């Protein structure tokens, strides 16, 4: 009898040990959830801002707010000069046709760019949903405009190519009557949250099973108004994506850079030293807007080398790099955006070994005759230098060589010659080749094995 009791106790203890951990709806518990490994390994993603704002395609994706919220004169003038009296923002929606949107073409482009995840705007602050939301009647892509489920179509296309799928979702809607009512009540009521925000979040998760939820539009209210912790506890405990899903930190005005999964902190966040928490830099190829603009100029488009430098720096500091593009109202990705994405992909084909699944090294960067950023993987150190030194020699002060040290350049055959200088560090002789023969045009990566 005693033996049976002991066996039952052991079995019960094992059952408890094997039971999945449950998270409670508070930040102390939710913040303790380990980040699924796929996100840190991915490193590079593509952000897509697409919605009714792609129709006027002027100024920025905040067009509606600047026109009728803070009533900026330039936006007032644009409407007066280009549209008849009485034209409303809702009148733009039928022109959001997505007629040339071929999700497989988009997915092929993102794959060629080397992206490991893609994040699509399901709903921006204008409130228009890119899926048939049951609580957004006649203000969604199925009822008006494209008459298509844009979220579902792109998700199917990217997942066929083993690209992770993330969904951007704005918590607030600028002009929704229930949101304005809650604002009038000092956010002491939650009419909008209960009728709109939370039903849509649960619907997105259950319908599309996203790998990532990119929350935004949180800044006017605390997380208690949004019921964020209750949603995240369900997401981590009971949702169909509970084991793999990732979230960011925009769940209330008190959360950015403090609570959530990984940290965005603010748009285009770029720390100067290694943070102690996983983070992501989200930035836009058009430096002046996230949505497509018909009036953009080359001066606002990030150059290829600028994008790659940001990617290298971000990864060296332990972050992910999420690069945004804005398609047209018709569903086209304009050639300049395609060119930039393909340039990143070409660079990653050669240097991706130093990026994907890498970790920050003990020293993240140094600057001598060029700027160098370090990463490491499987005891190998990678040093990416941004500018080719005039004397053809890269000196690295941080790595400590051994008699077995070997140094190569990614994309080239053969070892590079090097010497150890007591003051200058490792002096590496670069190959004497014309630029057309080098593996890439900028940001070359040295691979160092058997170094300390």
Swiss-Prot record:
Catalytic activity from the UniProt record: an alpha-L-fucoside + H2O = L-fucose + an alcohol; a neolactoside IV(2)-alpha-Fuc-nLc4Cer(d18:1(4E)) + H2O = a neolactoside nLc4Cer(d18:1(4E)) + L-fucose; a neolactoside IV(2)-alpha-Fuc-nLc4Cer(d18:0) + H2O = a neolactoside nLc4Cer(d18:0) + L-fucose
GO molecular function: alpha-L-fucosidase activity
Primary location group: other
BP-aspect Gene Ontology terms: fucose metabolic process; glycoside catabolic process; lipid metabolic process
Family: Belongs to the glycosyl hydrolase 29 family.
Protein name according to UniProt: Tissue alpha-L-fucosidase
EC number: 3.2.1.51
PROSITE patterns: ALPHA_L_FUCOSIDASE
Organism per entry: Mus musculus
Gene Ontology CC: lysosome
EC category: hydrolase
Signal peptide: 1-17
Alphabetized UniProt keyword annotations: Glycoprotein, Glycosidase, Hydrolase, Lipid metabolism, Lysosome, Signal
């Amino acid at each position: 009898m005693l033996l049976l009791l002991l066996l039952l106790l052991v079995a019960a203890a094992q059952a408890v040990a094997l039971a999945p951990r449950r998270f409670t709806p508070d930040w102390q518990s939710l913040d303790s959830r380990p980040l699924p490994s796929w996100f840190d390994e991915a490193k590079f993603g593509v952000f897509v801002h697409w919605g009714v704002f792609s129709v006027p395609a002027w100024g920025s994706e905040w067009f509606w707010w600047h026109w009728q919220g803070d009533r900026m004169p330039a936006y007032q003038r644009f409407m007066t000069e280009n549209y008849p009296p009485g034209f409303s923002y809702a009148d733009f929606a039928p022109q959001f046709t997505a007629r040339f949107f071929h999700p497989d073409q988009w997915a092929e482009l993102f794959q060629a760019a080397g992206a490991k995840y893609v994040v699509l705007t399901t709903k921006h602050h204008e409130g228009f949903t890119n899926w048939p939301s049951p609580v957004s009647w006649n203000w969604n892509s199925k009822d008006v405009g494209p008459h298509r489920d844009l979220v579902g179509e792109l998700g199917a296309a990217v997942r066929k190519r083993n690209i992770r799928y993330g969904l951007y979702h704005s918590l607030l809607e600028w002009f929704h009557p229930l949101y304005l009512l809650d604002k009038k009540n000092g956010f002491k009521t939650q009419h909008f949250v209960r009728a709109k925000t939370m039903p849509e979040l649960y619907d997105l998760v259950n319908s599309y099973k996203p790998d990532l939820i990119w929350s935004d539009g949180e800044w006017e209210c605390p997380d208690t108004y949004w019921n964020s912790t209750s949603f995240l506890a369900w997401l981590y405990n009971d949702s169909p994506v509970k084991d793999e899903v990732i979230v960011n930190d925009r769940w209330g005005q008190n959360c950015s850079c403090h609570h959530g999964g990984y940290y965005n902190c603010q748009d285009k966040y770029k720390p100067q030293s290694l943070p102690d928490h996983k983070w992501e830099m989200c930035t836009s190829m058009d430096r002046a807007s996230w949505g497509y603009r018909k009036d953009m100029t080359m001066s606002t488009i990030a150059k290829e080398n600028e994008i790659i430098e940001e990617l290298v720096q971000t990864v060296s500091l332990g972050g992910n790099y999420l690069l945004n593009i804005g398609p047209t109202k018709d569903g086209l990705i304009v050639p300049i955006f395609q060119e930039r994405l393909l340039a990143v992909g070409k660079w990653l084909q050669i240097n991706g070994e130093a990026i994907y699944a890498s970790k920050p090294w003990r020293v993240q960067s140094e600057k001598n005759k060029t700027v160098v950023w370090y990463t490491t993987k499987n005891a190998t150190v990678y040093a990416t230098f941004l500018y080719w030194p005039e004397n053809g020699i890269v000196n690295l002060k941080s790595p400590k060589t051994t008699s077995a040290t070997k140094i190569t350049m990614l994309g080239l055959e053969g070892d590079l010659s090097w010497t150890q200088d007591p003051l200058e560090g490792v002096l590496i002789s670069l190959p004497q080749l014309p630029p057309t023969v080098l593996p890439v045009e900028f940001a070359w990566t040295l691979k160092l094995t058997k170094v300390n």
